[in-house]
Regions:
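Conserved functional hotspot residues or short segments at active or partner-binding sites
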Residues: 28-29, 33, 38-219
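Conserved phosphate-handling catalytic cores of large alpha/beta enzymes
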Residues: 2-38
Length: 219
């Protein structure tokens, strides 16, 4: 939805919804909502997850009333309920364990990254003055992972070894990306985190393949 920020006298701000959101092709992607159905609106994402829509394209169904022809190529897409991608990438749930969720939700992954940089900022800037050098050479060491586990124990987060081992590569990537964000900028965070983003990598593959691009997005 499109929201207009309105400053208030006490320094706070409200964001007032003023219109639905349309893409440049003229396609409405506003999630539908009706008066009296607020609970359904807020539970939409979890309901889609429970129906398997994030894991299998076959679980997603659109009524014909949502069909829309794009303005230029006249491809059939579906409007009014979010964007159905041209190429469906299922969510990989294997690495996103409950233990990983607790570490992130408690702020520990972010905190251990900040603590590391507070101790090593000058050394890191001297060793990695350029981001590309950092991206290529910096490795999250086991000592830092042990520090994270100790912090988790102090917060009474019960250690789950099997879940930790499954999520460990993802946690290490997130720590590296968070350090890059604070050492350089947000753009560098995404350059690292997107290296392991299947949707992003598939999009790059399609964009860089003219034949595939035209087949999927042409008239």
């Amino acid at each position: 939805m499109v929201q207009k920020p309105i400053p208030l006298p006490d320094g706070s701000m409200i964001r007032l919804t003023v219109s639905r959101y349309y893409t440049p092709t003229g396609r409405c992607i506003q999630k539908p909502y009706e008066n009296g159905k607020m609970e359904e609106y807020h539970h939409d994402l979890i309901d889609r997850y429970n129906r398997g829509e994030l894991m299998s394209a076959d679980s997603i169904h659109f009524p014909d009333s949502m069909k829309y022809n794009t303005l230029v190529t006249e491809r059939i897409v579906y409007g009014g309920g979010g964007i159905m991608p041209d190429v469906f990438i299922p969510v990989d749930t294997a690495r996103y364990t409950d233990y990983h969720r607790k570490l992130v939700a408690s702020g520990l992954v972010n905190r251990v990254s900040m603590n590391y940089l507070d101790r090593n900022r000058n050394r890191m800037m001297a060793k990695y003055p350029k981001f590309q050098q950092y991206k290529q050479d910096f490795v999250v060491e086991e000592d830092l992972m042990e520090e994270l586990l100790k912090m988790a124990g102090d917060e009474k987060i019960e250690f789950e070894e099997e879940q930790y081992n499954r999520s460990k590569p993802l946690i290490m990537l997130q720590i590296k990306a968070l350090i890059a964000r604070d050492l350089y900028d947000m753009a560098q965070y995404f350059q690292i985190i997107n290296d392991d983003n299947p949707s992003y990598q598939k999009a790059l593959q399609i964009i860089n393949n003219k034949e595939t691009y035209n087949r999927l997005l042409g008239r």
